[in-house]
Amino acid sequence: MVEAFKIIGGKKIAGELKVDGSKNSTLPIMIATLVEKGTYVLRNVPDLRDIRTLVALLESLGLEVEKLDANSYKIINNGLSGAEASYDLVKKMRASFLVMGGMLAIEKRGKVALPGGCAIGARPVDLHLKGFEALGAKINIEHGYVEATTENGLIGGNIVLDFPSVGATENIIMAAVKAKGKTVLENAAKEPEIEDLCNFLIKMGAKISGVGTSRLEIDGVDKLTACEYTIIPDRIVAGTYIIASILFDGSIKVSGIVPEHLSSFLLKLEEMGTKFKIEGDKLEVLTKLSDLKPAKVTTMPHPGFPTDLQSPMMTLMCLVNGTSEIKETIFENRFMHVPELNRMGAKIEIDSSTAKITGVENFSSAEVMASDLRAGASLILAALKANGESLVNRIYHVDRGYENFEEKFKALGANIERIKTEA
């Protein structure tokens, strides 16, 4: 038996949605507690399946993890019990591969299973491994495991990433903070989540300059100090909630946002005719859905339009009069939600990496299946708009990235229920 959402859509929903802490910040920051012994307290941690998966992985490596409340954790690092991350845990989530950088920093070696996770494209770890090699690690891959070893610890080096990979940037930063000498990382990813990781490590005493730019300079230090830290809000959850608000003519206020983390997304929505009122961390939509006009979107590394908001944006474009386009440049296979939206009455055609979306009046209710986390969110939004009963299967994907999704939308008046199904 698996879980699904039964949604009776077409209802009026209104109220306020508060954005949770960032999953994509929490994962690397939790992993960064491997880098130095001590007691850490992390706040604004989202209550998600991926976080629970990571807790099990950290505990398997010898860390003590205590949940203080729904969104706070205490992590005690008294030294690792081993430097091997097994396939059983790593296969559940790609971010698990980030433990390699932390293990190299503290243990000078690491052995990690090649990762599993989402069904979106290849997502190779080659860039991570090139980075480790540039810092003096020897890499050996066999039997589905990557083993990295060093003679006497890592040594600073110059690294140019072929692509600004978020995961590779994070893994290399963690490995380099205690390496001997200076590391220069060019073409680094610039996502807010990278900044958050850097700020956490800087609070611990790491010497990192160029934070928020594509060129990071890291002067290795011998010792860091464990600290308390508050995670930034999740910009992808924020974007999803803002799209929900537009779909319902601005009846949902969104709080807990960082507007500068959403610049390209908000600019694109403004180009489509959306007007906002932003006060501090609160955003209100002042436009009706029917007033929007079509647009073209190309997903890009930050600060461009985020690939993680591509599928929720597509749901919105399905109900905008005229023809819109989305070009996906980050991941292959990231249009798996398209056949499902088409089942709900959308008119979307795919040509290679571009989706052409012709607006329709509304979605029709249907049974659909989430293929990944963001696709799941896009289908739920469509089902909330559609008149009648829809079933969204495989919602375990959604639980990986959205905290208490159904409870939050129920509080707005949505008719959404978690049920068990055979599918």
UniProtKB/Swiss-Prot annotation:
InterPro entries xrefs: Enolpyruvate_Tfrase_dom, Enolpyruvate_Tfrase_sf, MurA_subfamily, RNA3'P_cycl/enolpyr_Trfase_a/b, UDP_GlcNAc_COvinyl_MurA
Q: Which Pfam families match?
A: EPSP_synthase
Family membership, please give it: Belongs to the EPSP synthase family. MurA subfamily.
Catalyses which reaction(s): phosphoenolpyruvate + UDP-N-acetyl-alpha-D-glucosamine = UDP-N-acetyl-3-O-(1-carboxyvinyl)-alpha-D-glucosamine + phosphate
Transmembrane residue ranges: none
Q: What does this protein do?
A: Cell wall formation. Adds enolpyruvyl to UDP-N-acetylglucosamine.
Compartmental location: Cytoplasm
Q: What is this protein called?
A: UDP-N-acetylglucosamine 1-carboxyvinyltransferase
Source taxonomy: Bacteria, Fusobacteriati, Fusobacteriota, Fusobacteriia, Fusobacteriales
Gene3D superfamilies with a match to the protein in the record:
Enolpyruvate transferase domain
- PANTHER family named in the record: UDP-N-ACETYLGLUCOSAMINE 1-CARBOXYVINYLTRANSFERASE (PTHR43783:SF1)
Protein keywords: Cell cycle, Cell division, Cell shape, Cell wall biogenesis/degradation, Cytoplasm, Peptidoglycan synthesis, Pyruvate, Transferase
What residues bind phosphoenolpyruvate, as annotated? 23-24
Q: Which residues form the active site?
A: 118
List modified residues, type 2-(S-cysteinyl)pyruvic acid O-phosphothioketal: 118
Query: Its Gene Ontology biological processes?
Result: cell division; cell wall organization; peptidoglycan biosynthetic process; regulation of cell shape; UDP-N-acetylgalactosamine biosynthetic process
Does the keyword field hold Cytoplasm? yes
UniProt keyword Lipoprotein, yes or no: no
| Chain residues that bind UDP-N-acetyl-alpha-D-glucosamine | 94, 123-127, 308, 330
Cite the annotated pathway: Cell wall biogenesis; peptidoglycan biosynthesis
Q: What is its EC number?
A: 2.5.1.7
GO molecular function terms noted in the UniProt entry: UDP-N-acetylglucosamine 1-carboxyvinyltransferase activity
Checking SUPFAM superfamilies in the record gives: EPT/RTPC-like
An example GO CC term for this entry is: cytoplasm
